[in-house]
């Protein structure tokens, strides 16, 4: 039975960039102590062309309570360090070695000594390199390192006797294990230099014998694993499985045990171990040894000092491995430790074992029950994360809906930027690109590569116990780690659903539901889930009863989608349960968490990226399982006619939980980084989350996060509101607003809730869906309906203290003025206009004007009225609605000054794109009114138009004179009209006789229309010209 599950933690997965912010490169030179640093530009110095990025990785707990991660590259020439707590914002340090390590990571040691990382490595050229990196440099933003930070020396000729294992004993002493089986001590003599010390053995003489006899290396019995006991004894295991104990005070071998002879296995099954590795683990005085017998054997023993003061090894028991013989598993790491919080009846010691087969890994825990070492049990783990187990989900969405953009977003959210970009790079290198009508095929290829890349990135390298007992697996790819989390009861049920284990009534009930649900397609389950959301959001009308809603779900989603025999099996099995009791147990004891307070936890005082990721990923796993169970339980109410009076409260609670679970899962897909920020802020004293050191603290904290999720209000959900504020109000350009609309807002906003519908309209607008946005903005009288119901962050926009640049500030500020309706639609019109949606801008400004006329009793500021009219005019001009333009100009004298009206008329009369149509409209309207004996324009406007038209006369163009003549004639200014024609005659010296005659006749006809002879005259400057004068001039042509 699997009791632990795996949580993958890529430390960069919550960020847009696939590499950390700050990378520093240090170069070790053979010639001099190079203190110069080269700051990295874009990535670490060894981007990964192969599936994995390093030959080894591990993580050390330092004296400042920080964890430092290190990676040794696959070529053994690059050493990389980064902080576990904040790999993205912290500093990544790359140290470039002058030569490769002699034997990969086995001739490398890293320890903390006096606030420094002390790194020792034997290079292939036989030199011994020492690095000293201050912790203050590792955890600061500084990119310079003062003083001597590396030293190269040759304390021994390692080209003669080749080392294959370097072991750290103390800051002053290390042990080199040689290929010929010998041991060599390296002692620091002056704080810098080392001198060799030979152990009292005959390995050197044996090596000479082999050299002259030309014996092969297979004759050697080299050390393959080593542990230090009480800082005095070396406990070593050799290739031939001899356990040897060396006394470091005398450099002599004091014990030599043949481990194979102490096993019950057939010695003929023994195979020599060639490679150095983790075959020993020591806790207090208990030693465990992995022996290569049969399918693997763990020998348990104790180290004790006998009466003569000699350290001895006492055999206790042999425990076979618990591995299937169908695969070849090799050991990665093993850690013997005190009992973990595994919820077992008895425990004396735990052995954590990490295996590997290809790129797959397996973690097991051997629980030794008591001191006899005879009673034990194997505890298994789920060795794939829930994300991996559900990896088919995203492509189903793409395949069925054809929504390629959503498919991309889902995949990138699931795998993170680093893995996503690596997968795209692989496809590009293989000439696989997205072509027209081949989107789904490309996404299928991308998903396959993503899985492979993620598997390679997560290949296990070592184990670190985080805090007191939390199992952290370090992966070969930098920034990739996995944590094995102790399962809750519900998680245990989920992961062991297909096991033969008998459990409680609730477990049997859930297994029954899961059996039927597994016969339905993912499409059917998704459609049912969406319908359950519709019940909460109001998409299904509230006027329908619960039974009617479930009937609708059955007909639309389930009818003809299952086998009747499967339904009968489900019905028969459900009859064996007391369902109300089982549901009470599920909801109240397993799903709904207890009450937690921030003071129950140790709040972190600074950001910790690792714990943030682990917290969110653990919550995501829990909610995913809760969501699946909740959906399956609700499904039974759709299938069977259950009494809603008995189950009404259960249904209501489950629908509420389903909504909140589904919302958080979609927010997780939308933006993990933002969701983590919200969760940590709401659950800790200083908004940075909490520190946890054991499984009990971790599980309790996840339960507290779950409590925050389940206790959140649906109508004003804090998680939903925070995402809305970030995506719509703050509107940072890098955020995918359209994905937010489709993934979060559309499915989850509450219909018939004025505030949420107003917010939905804002989101539609931000996505460019202006027609839908306008429609939603018309649903309610928002300035009245929601003015005192706005969530805090929208209320803040109305404050004078708000200094942000949100496009929504001015719109929301209209709620605070008396004339809020006209102001609201004016600002809404401006928003549409600025986004090139003039059609809806015009509709909004028209409604604004309507409200101004309707609410005449509400006084509007003069400045507002002017701006409103100007905006209205601009939109009318845009659509060439010149009749309406003239109405606004002639009726808006109270709002528009003479200067403003003049500017508009000047634009319309002088700009070629408007002048012809506008002037013809003006003449038509003037003519229509003159027939009734009225003037269309006010006198002041007539003067403005006349003045503008008169300005054009300087050109001498006949059309300009004709326009002014016509305008004056239609506005009862006949004498002035005649004068403009006479002015034209005088200006045109070379005017032909025929046109000049026509002009004279027109002037004469105008003057002839005056009844009195005393009125038959015009002015030419200060001179009076009579009708008689004009006739004489005409005769003189």
Swiss-Prot record:
Segments forming a coiled coil: none
The keyword Membrane belongs to this UniProt entry's keyword annotation: yes
Protein name in UniProt: Nucleoporin NUP120
Gene Ontology molecular function: identical protein binding; structural constituent of nuclear pore
N-terminal signal peptide: none
Record's function text: Functions as a component of the nuclear pore complex (NPC). NPC components, collectively referred to as nucleoporins (NUPs), can play the role of both NPC structural components and of docking or interaction partners for transiently associated nuclear transport factors. NUP120 is involved in nuclear poly(A)+ RNA and pre-ribosome export, in GSP1 nuclear import, in NPC assembly and distribution, as well as in nuclear envelope organization.
Region described as Leucine-zipper 2: 290-311
GO CC field: chromosome, telomeric region; nuclear envelope; nuclear membrane; nuclear pore; nuclear pore outer ring
Region called Leucine-zipper 1, residue ranges: 131-152
Xref: InterPro entries: Nucleoporin_Nup160 (IPR021717), NUP120_helical_saccharomycetes (IPR055090)
Entry membrane topology: Peripheral membrane protein
The entry's keywords: Coiled coil, Membrane, mRNA transport, Nuclear pore complex, Nucleus, Phosphoprotein, Protein transport, Translocation, Transport
Lineage of origin: Eukaryota, Fungi, Dikarya, Ascomycota, Saccharomycotina
Modified residues (Phosphothreonine): 417
Oligomeric and partner information: Component of the nuclear pore complex (NPC). NPC constitutes the exclusive means of nucleocytoplasmic transport. NPCs allow the passive diffusion of ions and small molecules and the active, nuclear transport receptor-mediated bidirectional transport of macromolecules such as proteins, RNAs, ribonucleoparticles (RNPs), and ribosomal subunits across the nuclear envelope. Due to its 8-fold rotational symmetry, all subunits are present with 8 copies or multiples thereof.
Subcellular location: Nucleus, Nuclear pore complex; Nucleus membrane
GO biological processes: double-strand break repair; mRNA export from nucleus; mRNA export from nucleus in response to heat stress; negative regulation of transcription by RNA polymerase II; nuclear pore localization; nucleocytoplasmic transport; positive regulation of DNA-templated transcription; positive regulation of transcription by RNA polymerase II
């Amino acid at each position: 039975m699997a009791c632990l599950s795996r949580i993958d933690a890529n430390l960069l997965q919550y960020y847009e960039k696939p590499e950390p912010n700050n990378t520093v490169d240090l170069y070790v030179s053979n010639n001099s102590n190079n203190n110069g640093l080269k700051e990295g530009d874009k990535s670490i110095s060894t981007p990964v062309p192969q599936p994995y990025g390093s030959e080894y990785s591990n993580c050390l707990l330092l004296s400042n309570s920080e964890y430092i991660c290190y990676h040794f590259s696959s070529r053994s020439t690059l050493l990389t360090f980064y902080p576990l707590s904040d790999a993205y914002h912290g500093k990544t340090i790359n140290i470039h070695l002058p030569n490769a390590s002699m034997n990969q990571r086995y001739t490398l040691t890293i320890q903390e000594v006096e606030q420094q990382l002390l790194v020792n490595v034997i290079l292939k050229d036989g030199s011994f390199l020492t690095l000293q990196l201050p912790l203050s440099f590792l955890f600061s933003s500084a990119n310079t390192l003062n003083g001597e930070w590396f030293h190269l020396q040759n304390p021994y000729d390692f080209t003669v006797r080749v080392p294959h294992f370097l072991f750290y004993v103390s800051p002053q002493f290390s042990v080199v294990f040689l290929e010929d089986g010998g041991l060599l001590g390296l002692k620091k003599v002056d704080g810098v230099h080392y001198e060799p010390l030979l152990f009292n053995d005959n390995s050197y003489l044996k090596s000479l014998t082999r050299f002259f006899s030309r014996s092969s290396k297979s004759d050697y019995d080299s050390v393959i694993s080593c542990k230090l006991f009480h800082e005095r004894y070396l406990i070593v295991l050799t290739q031939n499985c001899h356990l040897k104990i060396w006394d470091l005070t005398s450099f002599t071998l004091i014990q030599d045990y043949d481990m194979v002879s102490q096993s019950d296995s057939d010695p003929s099954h023994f195979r020599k171990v060639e490679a150095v590795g983790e075959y020993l683990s020591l806790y207090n005085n208990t030693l465990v040894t992995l022996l290569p017998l049969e399918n693997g054997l763990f020998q348990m023993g104790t180290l004790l000092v006998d009466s003569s003061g000699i350290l001895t090894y006492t055999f206790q028991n042999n425990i076979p491995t618990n591995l299937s013989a169908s695969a070849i598993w090799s050991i990665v790491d093993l850690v013997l430790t005190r009992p973990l919080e595994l919820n077992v009846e008895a425990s004396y010691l735990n052995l954590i074992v990490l295996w590997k087969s290809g790129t797959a890994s397996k973690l097991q825990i051997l629980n030794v029950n008591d001191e006899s070492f005879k009673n034990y049990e194997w505890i298994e783990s789920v060795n794939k994360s829930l994300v991996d187990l559900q990896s088919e989900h995203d492509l189903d969405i793409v395949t069925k809906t054809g929504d390629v953009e959503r498919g991309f977003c889902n995949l990138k959210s699931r795998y993170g930027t680093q893995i996503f970009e690596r997968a795209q790079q692989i496809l590009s290198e293989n000439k696989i690109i997205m072509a027209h009508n081949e989107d789904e095929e490309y996404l299928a290829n991308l998903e396959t590569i993503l899985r492979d890349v993620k598997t390679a990135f997560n290949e296990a390298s070592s184990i670190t116990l985080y805090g007191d007992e939390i199992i952290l697996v370090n992966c070969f790819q930098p920034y990739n780690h996995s944590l094995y989390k102790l399962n809750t009861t519900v998680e245990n049920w989920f992961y062991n659903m297909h096991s033969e284990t008998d459990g409680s009534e609730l477990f049997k009930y859930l297994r029954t539901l899961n059996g039927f649900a597994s016969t339905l397609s993912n499409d059917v389950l998704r459609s049912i889930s969406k319908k359950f959301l519709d019940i909460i959001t109001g998409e299904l009308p509230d006027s329908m009863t619960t039974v009617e809603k479930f009937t609708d779900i059955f007909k639309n989603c389930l009818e003809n989608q299952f086998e009747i025999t499967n339904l009968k099996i489900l019905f028969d099995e459900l009859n064996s349960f007391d369902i109300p009791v089982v549901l009470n147990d599920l909801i109240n004891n397993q799903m709904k968490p207890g009450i937690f307070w921030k003071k129950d936890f140790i709040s972190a005082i600074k950001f910790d990226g690792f714990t943030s990721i682990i917290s969110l990923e653990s919550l995501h796993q829990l909610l995913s399982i809760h969501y699946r169970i909740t959906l399956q339980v609700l499904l039974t109410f759709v299938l069977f006619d259950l009494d809603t009076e008995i189950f009404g409260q259960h249904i209501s609670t489950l629908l509420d939980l389903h909504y909140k679970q589904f919302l958080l899962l979609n927010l997780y897909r939308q933006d993990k980084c933002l969701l983590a920020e919200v969760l940590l802020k709401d659950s800790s004293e200083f908004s940075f989350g909490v520190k946890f050191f054991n499984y009990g603290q971790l599980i309790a904290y996840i339960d507290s996060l779950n409590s925050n999720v389940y206790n959140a209000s649906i109508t004003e959900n804090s998680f939903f509101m925070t995402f809305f504020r970030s995506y719509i109000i703050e509107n940072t350009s890098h955020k995918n607003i359209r994905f937010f609309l489709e993934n979060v807002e559309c499915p989850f906003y509450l219909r018939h809730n004025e505030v949420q519908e107003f917010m939905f309209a804002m989101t539609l607008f931000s996505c460019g869906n202006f027609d839908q946005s306008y429609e939603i903005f018309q649903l309610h009288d928002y300035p009245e309906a929601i003015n005192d119901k706005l969530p805090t962050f929208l209320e803040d926009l109305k404050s004078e203290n708000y200094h942000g640049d949100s496009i929504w500030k001015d719109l929301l500020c209209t709620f605070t003025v008396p004339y809020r309706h006209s102001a609201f639609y004016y600002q809404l019109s401006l928003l549409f206009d600025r986004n090139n949606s003039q059609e809806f801008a015009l509709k909004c400004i028209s409604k604004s004007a309507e409200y101004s006329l309707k609410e005449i009793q509400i006084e509007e500021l003069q400045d507002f009225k002017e701006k409103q009219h100007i905006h209205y005019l601009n939109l009318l001009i845009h659509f060439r609605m010149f009749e309406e333009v003239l109405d606004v100009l002639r009726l808006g004298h109270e709002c528009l000054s003479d200067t403003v009206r003049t500017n508009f008329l000047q634009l319309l009369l002088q700009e070629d794109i408007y002048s012809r149509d506008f002037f013809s409209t003006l003449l038509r309207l003037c003519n229509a009114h003159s027939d009734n004996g009225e003037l269309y324009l006010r006198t002041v406007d007539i003067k403005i138009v006349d003045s503008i038209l008169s300005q054009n006369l300087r050109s001498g163009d006949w059309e300009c004179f004709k326009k002014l003549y016509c305008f004056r004639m239609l506005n009862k200014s006949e004498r002035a009209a005649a004068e403009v024609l006479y002015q034209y005659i005088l200006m045109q010296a070379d005017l032909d006789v025929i046109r000049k005659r026509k002009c004279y006749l027109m002037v004469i006809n105008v003057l002839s229309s005056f009844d009195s002879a005393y009125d038959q005259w015009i002015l030419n400057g200060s001179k009076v010209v009579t009708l008689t004068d004009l006739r004489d001039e005409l005769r003189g042509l």
